[in-house]
Amino acid sequence: MPKHAKSARLLRVEGTIQREISEILVKEVSDPRLKDVTITGIDMTPDFSIAYVYWTIYSDLASSGEKADAGLQAAKGLIKRQLARKMTTFKIPDLIFKRDTAIEYGDHIEQLIAKLNHESK
């Protein structure tokens, strides 16, 4: 969780960037490595200079995540250019892609609970 209190403007810009990047991935990026990538959140610095873009992929293969990360890095320039076209902000932030492992962690916890329940029967 960020240490700073987020302004309404910062929250609004984060939401806009999340929607726009999601749309860009679906409509304008043709890289098959990004087919199942979902943008789960954006966390921007208070000065709007950096946007941490959290993503996940719905695949059990570890290689899919690595390929998706490589695909996002390859598409970063295109995504940033398209953001610049679509947004009215003065400056487009630098994009740093980070894999969101919360869903995978939640699945792991559910599996552990199911295993414990099965063993206790």
UniProtKB/Swiss-Prot annotation:
Keywords: Cytoplasm, Ribosome biogenesis. One of its GO terms (molecular function) is ribosomal small subunit binding. Transmembrane segments: none annotated. InterPro entries: KH_dom-like_a/b, RbfA, RbfA_dom_sf. Gene3D superfamilies: 3.30.300.20. GO terms for cellular component: cytosol. One of its GO terms (biological process) is maturation of SSU-rRNA. It is found in: Cytoplasm. Monomer. Binds 30S ribosomal subunits, but not 50S ribosomal subunits or 70S ribosomes. Belongs to the RbfA family. NCBIfam families: rbfA (TIGR00082). One of several proteins that assist in the late maturation steps of the functional core of the 30S ribosomal subunit. Associates with free 30S ribosomal subunits (but not with 30S subunits that are part of 70S ribosomes or polysomes). Required for efficient processing of 16S rRNA. May interact with the 5'-terminal helix region of 16S rRNA. This is Ribosome-binding factor A. It comes from Oenococcus oeni (strain ATCC BAA-331 / PSU-1).
